[in-house]
Amino acid sequence: MDGLLIDSEPLWQEAAQESLEGLGVTIDDDLYASTIGLRTRECLEHWFTHFGIDHVLIPATDEDITARVILKVEKSGRLMNGVIKAMDLMEQLGYRIGLATSSPTSLIKKVLSKTNLEGRFHAIASAEFLPFGKPHPQVYLDCAMSLRSIPSSCICFEDSFNGMIAAKAARMKCIVIPSPAAAHKSVWGAADLTLASLDDLTKETLLRI
C-alpha cells in the first residue's frame, strides 16, 4: 500500500524522524530504506538495536509514529501515478483485487477514505496482528485465501524488497515498481517483472506474466 497505492513513504520517514528526534537520534536514508516494507514495530526493533535504545520504548513510539502518519496522509496523501488506470484495467480483465499490507488497520482505513478507493478491493489483509510481517508470506497467503484464489494464480505488485520476498515466498508472481531512488539497485532479480510506474501496466503484461 505505502509507496505503491499512495505516496506515503516520505510521510513515514518524516514521521519516524520527528518521533525519534525526541530520543536524540537521526535516521539516515540508507537505514530507513533497509526497513521499507516491514511493520513499524519491526522497523523500530531494528533502529533501536542500531542506536542502543531501550526496546521498552517501542510500543509508545510505534503508536506515535502511526498517529503522525495518519495526520500526514489526511493532510497531503496522494495516489501514486497509474493506480486508477491499473485497477480499472484489472477489473476489466476480471481480476479480483486484494490489498495485502504491513500497515495497521487504522491507516488502511484512512488511506482508502482519502483516496476514494473504498469498495475497490475484494479482500484486505493486514499483517498488523500476525506473528510475522513481511518478508514472511503470511499476509499474502491470508489475502489469497480471502480472494478464494490459489497463491500461484496471484500477481502481486510491490515497491519494496521485503514485500517482493514475501510475495515470492508465497509462490506468487511479483511485479515490482521500486521508487526512483531504489530502481538502480541490484536486488530485484527475484521479481517476474520490473516497471517504472503502474502507468506502464498493460493488458499484454498481465496476460503474459
Regions found by a protein language model. Name each.
Residues 1-34:
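Active-site neighborhood of HAD-like aspartate-dependent phosphohydrolases
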Residues 19-20, 39-54, 111, 144:
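Helix-loop "lid/cap" segments that line or gate small-molecule binding pockets
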Residues 25-27, 53, 117, 149:
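Helix N-cap/coil-helix junction residues
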Residues 46-85, 93-95:
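Metal-dependent phosphoesterase signature
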